[in-house]
């Protein structure tokens, strides 16, 4: 039946509606048949206030989407909800037709193809060496703990006089404020500050400070970043040994993609500290047939 229809207008049709209909009804809705109003909304204004959901568009157009959550069995309320969704999508398509007059049809066709490719990428995921990652994480965390202990020996707790007693505040190596205070006590003259006047402490700035304490802090921040990445990858690794990060193809004002759960665009470059080790964790299921 799908062959008899020239165009399907759907909101999130490329990623959801068309694949679901093909799976459940045996239809063969092709990518070229789908006009996806979600992609159009994102393409014409990536940072649209309120977002791109059909519900948000219902509020903008003064035609509320409605609220229905129980899809256990078919009933008249469900049908009414479906019909209202359909009418709202029709109104949205009309609205976006006007918005899209300044855009070429090729721009939409390109984004539609990209979305389909990214959907396949998300479905496939990336093979991940979980065992090696956990071993690598343990190695880095061990050094982290050593630096934490070393910092406690170098910087004794600060004494704070309260009304009735003396309180001792231990040094926190993860506190940039405390790091700035202790380095200033050792003679450091910071040159970069926030708008509120707080000292800016970063890995890059610490690398320029010729003090062994500053180098220790810089090293700790590096380990903190790498262990954070490793933990996110390990947590996201599924039972089949693959990680499937989410990718939003049209989420930034410049049209660049946005990534999360985890951010697969943040894998360190091979030339950066521990970059080679991090990248070696990403592999292929069958090295005889695939390469990464």
Question: Where are the regions that the model predicts?
Answer:
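Conserved DEDDh/DEDDy metal-dependent 3′-5′ exonuclease domain
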Residues: 1-99
């Amino acid at each position: 039946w799908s062959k008899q229809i020239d165009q399907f207008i759907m909101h999130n049709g490329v990623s959801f509606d068309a694949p679901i209909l093909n799976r459940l009804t045996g239809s063969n809705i092709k990518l070229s048949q789908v006009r996806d109003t979600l992609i159009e909304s994102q393409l014409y204004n990536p940072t649209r206030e309120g977002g791109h959901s059909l519900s948000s568009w219902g509020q903008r157009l003064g035609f509320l989407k409605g609220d229905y959550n129980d899809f256990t069995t078919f009933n008249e309320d469900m049908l009414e909800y479906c019909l209202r969704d359909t009418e709202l999508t029709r109104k949205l398509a009309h609205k976006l037709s006007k918005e899209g007059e300044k855009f070429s049809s090729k721009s939409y066709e390109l984004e539609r193809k990209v979305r389909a490719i990214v959907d396949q990428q998300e479905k496939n995921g990336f093979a991940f060496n979980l065992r090696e990652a956990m071993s690598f994480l343990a190695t880095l965390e061990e050094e982290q703990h050593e630096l934490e202990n070393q910092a406690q020996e170098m910087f004794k707790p600060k004494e704070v006089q309260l009304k009735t007693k003396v309180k001792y505040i231990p040094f926190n190596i993860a506190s940039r404020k405390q790091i700035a205070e202790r380095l200033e006590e050792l003679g450091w003259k910071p040159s970069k500050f926030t708008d509120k006047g707080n000292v800016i402490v970063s890995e890059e700035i610490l690398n320029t400070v010729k003090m062994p304490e500053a180098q220790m802090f810089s090293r700790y921040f590096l380990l903190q970043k790498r262990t954070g990445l490793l933990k996110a990858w390990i947590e996201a690794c599924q039972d089949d040994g693959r990680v499937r990060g989410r990718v939003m193809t049209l989420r930034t004002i410049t049209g660049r993609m946005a990534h999360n759960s985890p951010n697969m665009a943040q894998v360190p470059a091979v030339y950066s500290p521990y970059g080679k080790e991090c990248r070696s964790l990403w592999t292929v299921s069958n090295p005889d047939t695939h390469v990464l």
